[in-house]
Amino acid sequence: SAAVSQLPGAVAVMDPFHVVHIAIDALEQCRQRVQQETLGHRGRKGDPLYAARKTLLTGTDILTDTSQARLDALFACPDHADVHATWRIYQDLLAAYRDRDPRRGKNTLHQLITTITRPDLPHTCIELARMGRTFKRRARDILAYFDHPHTSNGPTEAINGRLEHLRGIAQGFINHRNYRLRCLLHSGGFHHLLHP
């Protein structure tokens, strides 16, 4: 890519936001597939998988007793085995990133990637297999985060988001002064004048 050709010594790092998002997508797709296979329709208010969709995305360290009981009842059903396996991997991934010791977190995540990409593992859960292939392909980038902690393109994406928002609100302005005033108004440029 262009970045590699211009910065040959740079290390590619996949930040936790994007890695966890891959796991969340796999968990959601697995939940939706199992919902469709077991009940024959999309999630409805009284369906257990649909009712637990937000609880499934909550870390085990902050689950309430009620939420834990709901998950225990959900995973007691053998039809939900794929959801349980994907949820377990998701929780292990969160634990690896939340570990205060980067070396231990890296080892945990490396073992996780090795486990879900083992060839002898029966992949009945297609979402877990897909996530495993992605993690195996990007393993170096994922694990590099622990060697370069707090590496993220989040601040850059935040600035780009603000610029896109400003561009959107100022469309149609022909007068440059009005355009500039509108941008300052939305970006907080007048804050010190309005609230001295």
Predicted features, each with a name:
Residues S1-L7, F17-H21, G40-P196:
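Acidic/histidine-rich catalytic cores and adjacent linkers
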Residues S5-M14, R31:
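A short alpha->loop->secondary-structure connector
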Residues P16-G40:
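Short alpha-helix plus adjacent loop in nuclease-associated cores
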